[in-house]
Every structure is written in C-alpha cells, then in structure tokens.
Amino acid sequence: PAAGVKTARTPAGQPCIRTDKRLRTSNRKIFAIGDVAGGPQFTHSAGYQAGIVIRNILFHLPARANFNAMPRVTYTSPELAHVGLTEVEARRRHKSVKILRWPFEENDRARAERETRGMVKAVVTDNGKILGASIVGNQAGDLLAPWTLALTQGLGISALASVVVPYPTRGEVSKHAAGDYFSPTLFSTRTRRIIRFLSWFRR
C-alpha cells in the first residue's frame, strides 16, 4: 500500500467491513465507519461512529459503539419513529413487560392544530426500565429525543413521567405515556383505601 500501512482483511462475499466495538478493523490502525461498516445505515449513525473513532484516535479513550439506543425515523406522513426494542423483541428477551400508550387525540396542541393522528407506545419492564419506544404522528422524529436520552443514560420511566413539559406542546404525549405506568398503582383499591383513611382525619 502507498501509505505503508497493512490493509485490513475483508472476507470474500462479506457485504461490509468487520469491526470490533471500537470500530477497528482486523488492522487496529484502520477504522471503518458508515455504510461500509454495516449496522444502522443512517447519517446520524455515521456521525455517532465518527465521534467514537475521534475519541479513540485523538484522545486515546477506549470508546465503544453501542447501537442499542440508535433512533430511526421513516419520513412519511405521518412520521414513524422508533428507538430500542420493539414489543416483539422485548417479549422474547424478558419474561414480563408492560406496554404504555398515549394517543395524540388526547393532546391539546394536536387538537388545536387538527392533527391528531398517531400515538406514543413504550415498552418497559415491570420495575420501570425503558426498553423501547415507538411514535407515529406529526413530528414523531423530534418527539423521540427524550426516549433516546432515557435509553442512552439508563433512565427509568419515572424520569420521563416527572419531567415538566411546557403546555401546550406535543411533548406532553411522551410525559403522559410515561405516567401511564403508574396508573394501576394510583387507581388501585389499596390506594383508594389509603385516601379514604387519610380523609377521615380531615373531618
């Protein structure tokens, strides 16, 4: 090679260049990112991979790629957006999961704009760990950001349920979907009994 660097080995017939978690090829001085490296073939995915490589080369940080929280959006009308596991994937990996939903037709901003098609759907474990989220509707790609952040940082569903969201915005849909996780507890027979018991002291 002209650069005096040993080339990376790519098996014949392989559709992409094989890399490790740090995006290094079989020659550890050569990195591969973007479509040639396989994985999610999105512009934002290539940008994420570039950041991993820069941290490894320039700052000598052992940065590793993790595509578990890589968002994807289909720019149709309405938009389709997803991050993390689907319901089917989650049920295969976990014994029990909860499905949280909230429709845009319950959102005041969507009503005001007369664009109420769509909903937010989230998949969580019984203890509130977020596994994935899907959104269909106007600006679905933009609304996916908090779910992507939660998955990336390992935040539980309570983090999204407790965040203060400006009114009226479509962002409230995600907050309400997250809050749906607590509905069985808030409206359970036990909770009603506690409320009745406490109200007795106010008489």
Short names for language-model regions:
Residues 25, 29, 66-68, 126-127:
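Short, flexible turn/loop "capping" segments at secondary-structure junctions
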Residues 33-39, 67-76:
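Short, flexible active-site loops
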Residues 21-23, 65, 112:
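Short secondary-structure boundary/capping segments
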Residues 15, 71-72, 120:
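Small-molecule pocket liners
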Residues 6-11, 60-71, 95-100:
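A short alpha-helix-loop-beta-strand transition element characteristic
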Residues 44-67, 96, 151-157:
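Internal hydrophobic alpha-helix adjacent to the cofactor/substrate pocket in enzyme cavities
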Residues 75-86, 91-203:
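Flexible, glycine-rich terminal cap/loop adjacent to redox cofactors
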Residues 1-59, 161:
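FAD-site-proximal beta/loop scaffold in flavoenzymes
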